[in-house]
């Protein structure tokens, strides 16, 4: 497939206007304007060391100490992040009646905060902590109080924000950091997100694929698609013959599958969605949505 590359928005606008049931796959590039760093450079490589793996987190106390210490320092800023223009634009796309599903690889819940409702959090949500024994869950804000109680002084440390709601603590020893256990059963507590090396819950994947089957096109926003859990949906769309557009700076894993690629700020390229829609186009979108319901 020949990839059409443009530096401006008109081609993307036309792509979106042509389709009434868009399957949108979003990534870290959606949230950078909210102050949350992304993971990859323009070539798709890591900007920093790879995130912790599920196996290391579950198997090594030292890994959990390092993870939760960095999270204790970084969470307050992450938790205060607010939706930006990209999140609001995608919420507007849903309000226009053109969204089949917003499948996000992000764990920040900013799409929901902007008003999006048809959302699946592919990799979970960082604002919840889950016990790996009894499955009890608690808000991340509540767990923050436990971390600060057991580790006085750590909350006063200053460090640069990192992508996973944590902070870059490079010259700190974690040996004496206390990791609270589950108050109910004493087992390991983990953020309710999918770590590297951990499987996305099957039910979540199946729901997303069901929506993909009902879609008439795919739009990738702010993702290089280097992680297979997201890339496989684009692969499936290509096999089904769906047109695929990507809005992302730099290389994506799906470049040879795209019918359109736009390298432009997500907020700028999608700004038109927050303008009053053409009445005829809106009526047409609602008609198609009603017929396929």
From Swiss-Prot:
Keywords: Cytoplasm, Metal-binding, NAD, Transferase, Zinc. The active site is at 123 (proton acceptor). NAD-dependent protein deacetylase which modulates the activities of several enzymes which are inactive in their acetylated form. This is NAD-dependent protein deacetylase. It catalyses: N(6)-acetyl-L-lysyl-[protein] + NAD(+) + H2O = 2''-O-acetyl-ADP-D-ribose + nicotinamide + L-lysyl-[protein]. The keyword Cytoplasm applies. Zn(2+) binds at residues 131, 134, 182, 185. NAD(+) binds at residues 27-47, 105-108, 222-224, 248-250, 266. Its EC number is 2.3.1.286. InterPro entries: DHS-like_NAD/FAD-binding_dom, NAD-dep_sirtuin_deacylases, Sirtuin, Sirtuin_cat_small_dom_sf, Sirtuin_class_II, Ssirtuin_cat_dom. Its cofactor is Zn(2+). Residues 1-284 form the Deacetylase sirtuin-type domain. NCBIfam families: PRK05333.1 (NF003738).
């Amino acid at each position: 497939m020949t990839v059409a590359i443009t530096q401006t928005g008109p081609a993307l606008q036309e792509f979106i206007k042509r389709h009434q049931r868009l399957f949108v796959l979003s990534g870290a590039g959606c949230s950078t304007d909210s102050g949350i760093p992304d993971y990859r450079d323009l070539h798709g490589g890591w900007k920093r060391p790879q995130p912790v793996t599920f196996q290391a987190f579950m198997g090594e106390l030292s890994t959990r100490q390092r993870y939760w210490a960095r999270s204790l320092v970084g969470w307050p800023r992450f938790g205060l992040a607010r939706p930006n223009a990209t999140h609001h634009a995608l919420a507007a796309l849903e309000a226009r009646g053109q969204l089949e599903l917003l499948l996000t690889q992000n764990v920040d819940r900013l799409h929901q905060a902007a008003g999006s409702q048809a959302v699946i959090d592919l990799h979970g949500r960082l604002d919840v902590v889950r016990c790996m024994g009894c499955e009890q869950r608690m808000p991340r804000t509540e767990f923050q109080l436990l971390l600060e109680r057991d580790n006085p002084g750590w909350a006063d440390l200053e460090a640069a924000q990192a992508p996973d709601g944590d902070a870059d603590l490079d010259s700190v020893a974690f040996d004496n950091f206390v990791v609270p256990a589950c108050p109910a059963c004493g087992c390991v507590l983990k953020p309710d997100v999918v770590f590297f090396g951990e499987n996305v819950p099957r039910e979540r994947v199946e729901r997303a694929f069901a929506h993909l089957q009902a879609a008439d096109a795919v739009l990738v926003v702010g993702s290089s698609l280097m992680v297979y859990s997201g890339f496989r949906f684009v692969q499936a769309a290509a096999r089904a013959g769906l047109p695929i557009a990507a809005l992302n700076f730099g290389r994506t894993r799906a470049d040879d599958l795209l019918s359109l690629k736009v390298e432009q700020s997500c907020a700028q390229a999608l700004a038109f969605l927050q303008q009053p829609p053409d009445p005829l186009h809106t009526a047409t979108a609602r008609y198609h949505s009603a017929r396929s319901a």
